[in-house]
Amino acid sequence: DAIDDSNRVVIIASSTRDGEEEKVLTAFKRVLESHPNTVLLLVPRHPERFDAVATLVGRMGLRLGRRSKNDLLTEEMQVYLGDSMGEMMSYYRLASIAFVGGSLVNTGCQNVLEPAAFGIPVVTGPSQFNFATICRQLEAESALRTVANEKELADFLIDLIPDWARQAEMGRRGKALVEHNQDSLPALLSLLEPLLAEPSSDA
């Protein structure tokens, strides 16, 4: 795949909403100053916004590739737009760290269990009302970090990117919580049934 063969550090921003991408991109520009080998895999929640988000990326001075155009990830590319349907689980497989969208705007975050099930550290903004219980559990296990704004998001990513041991530990704790709660969280985990049934990518 376009990103699979890259040695870049991939941060996914999944299911982002209108008004949120600009905040994430602002944070990511700061991340690039410290970690220029990082790429942002940006996956907006609504397909009708793909083109508008692509325009925003260009307006913010970031170099863009698009899944819909089968662009290959080059060294110059800074943002890769996941403008396709039905590939979120494949995108999570490629990522080192996941920001879950809907959380830096007041719409409520999307499903934080998805990246946790892949053993990826999770970060969200403060709007978590629709997954409040599981967010609290993940945070108590040090598998999820809540940030208040784009500045805190940038600070967290800048610190976490070079800390491979912490990434692995956050990911391990999140995946363990998902597995431990399979019986006690049936409603939430029903969302993950297709994912949990998939073979491991390194099998």
Predicted segments with their positions:
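Nucleotide-activated sugar donor-binding and catalytic core shared by glycosyltransferases
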Residues: 1-203
